[in-house]
């Protein structure tokens, strides 16, 4: 059939005690045992995500992207360990490392996202994992993931990557040396802003550990959410291509605007890590930031408030365009943010880009009025 059905059920029944015991023995394969272990609806989505990542052994699903990041780290860390995180990390990743992992006796340090192979100079005797995010979702530095992974592998350190921006469609992470790849499926996988979900994919070495950690922590997604995510997955490629084309058109237009300083889009030559993006990525998604010249918080707010086709919201990757004021300096500890003007992050959705540029032009009129 075209669409796998939504298989709802908390309890799986067995024909007799012999089948019950056989099910218990084969529990490790993640198949029928109890509803928390999933059903064909969840399994079909997980299998599809695994097939999209060359070299993968399996995928676990989680009720949010933060749950996916947290469980992936918990699967490879123990008290006394240290984890390195990019200084451009998603803020909830920092919070989990600085607060929750600290309570468990696990320390965290942050590194310059442009450090590349020199990250090896930061490895200590207790460094057991490194969490990358490339590009960062505020300032969009593209990391040299293959170089970092080679350094990590040589030191016996697990390399994890938040790959939400590119997905495996534009950046097959395991092929570039990553051990464990994470996506907030809420974003581009689902694509319709109606489901929260995370996914973690890995190869044979870490698959059993990842799966058991998720099961022991009771991580499960509903079959209805899995069905909707699978629906989104079917149109992922065509949506990403439209996000890419529209975002790049708008980013180039913004570079010509007198109100704009930096445009932080990895496909633009002056974006940090652009050469790495050209080498490693198959495309760019619809999320990027730009800096307003000579502005302040008040004029930035006037610009955003004047937009009618851009919603104001924290998420991204959906069909709708969003605008958000962001302040990356607040989230840096190992490096300093070099920008001089207020930053705006745009999620370019699936609307007509000409309409979006007209809306942004109207916003710039209000921006200029707020400065006068």
Segments predicted by a language model, with ranges:
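Pocket-edge structural micro-motifs
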Residues: 8-12, 36, 63, 292, ...
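N-terminal glycine-rich, Lys/His-bearing helix-loop that initiates the first secondary-structure elements
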Residues: 1-29, 369-372
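PLP-dependent enzyme catalytic core of the Aspartate aminotransferase-like
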Residues: 98, 107-109, 128, 294, ...
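A residue-level signal for beta-strand positions that form part of recognition/binding surfaces
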Residues: 5, 31, 320, 343
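Conserved N-terminal alpha-helix of the aminotransferase class I/II PLP-enzyme fold
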Residues: 16-67, 92-99
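Short, solvent-exposed amphipathic alpha-helical segments in soluble enzyme
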Residues: 100-102, 216, 305-309, 361-365
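Active-site C-terminal subdomain of aminotransferase-like
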Residues: 15-16, 20, 29-30, 37-38, ...
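Conserved PLP-enzyme active-site core in the AAT-like
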Residues: 57-257, 264
């Amino acid at each position: 059939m075209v669409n796998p059905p939504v298989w709802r059920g908390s309890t799986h029944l067995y024909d007799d005690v012999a089948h019950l015991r056989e099910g218990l023995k084969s529990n490790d394969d993640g198949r029928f045992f109890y509803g928390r272990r999933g059903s064909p609806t969840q399994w079909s989505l997980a299998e599809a995500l695994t097939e999209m990542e060359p070299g993968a052994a399996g995928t676990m699903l989680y009720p949010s992207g933060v749950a996916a990041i947290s469980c992936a780290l918990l699967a490879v860390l123990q008290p006394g360990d240290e984890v390195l995180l990019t200084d451009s990390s998603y803020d909830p990743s920092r919070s989990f490392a600085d607060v929750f992992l600290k309570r468990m006796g696990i320390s965290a340090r942050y590194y310059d996202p442009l450090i590349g192979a020199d990250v090896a100079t930061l490895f200590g005797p207790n460094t057991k994992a490194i969490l990358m995010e490339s590009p960062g979702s505020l300032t969009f530095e593209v990391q040299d993931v293959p170089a970092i992974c080679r350094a990590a592998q040589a030191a016996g350190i697990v390399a994890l990557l938040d790959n939400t921006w590119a997905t495996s469609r534009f950046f097959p992470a395991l092929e570039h040396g990553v051990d464990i790849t994470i996506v907030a499926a809420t974003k581009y996988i689902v694509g319709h802003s109606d489901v929260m979900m995370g996914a973690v994919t890995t190869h044979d070495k870490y698959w059993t550990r990842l799966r058991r950690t998720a099961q022991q922590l009771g991580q499960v997604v509903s079959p209805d959410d899995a069905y909707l995510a699978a629906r989104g997955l079917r149109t992922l490629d065509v949506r990403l291509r439209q996000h890419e084309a529209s975002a790049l058109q708008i980013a180039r237009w913004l570079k010509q605007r007198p109100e704009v300083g930096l445009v932080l889009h990895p496909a633009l030559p002056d974006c940090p890590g652009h050469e790495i993006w050209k080498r490693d990525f198959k495309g760019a998604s619809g999320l990027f930031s730009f800096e307003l010249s000579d502005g302040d918080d008040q004029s930035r707010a006037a610009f955003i408030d004047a937009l009618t086709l851009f919603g104001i919201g924290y998420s991204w990757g959906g069909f709708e365009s969003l605008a958000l004021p962001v302040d990356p300096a607040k989230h840096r500890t190992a490096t300093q943010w070099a920008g001089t003007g207020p930053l705006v992050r745009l999620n370019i959705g699936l609307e007509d880009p000409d309409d979006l540029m007209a809306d942004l032009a109207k916003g710039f009129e209000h921006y200029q009025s707020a400065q006068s």
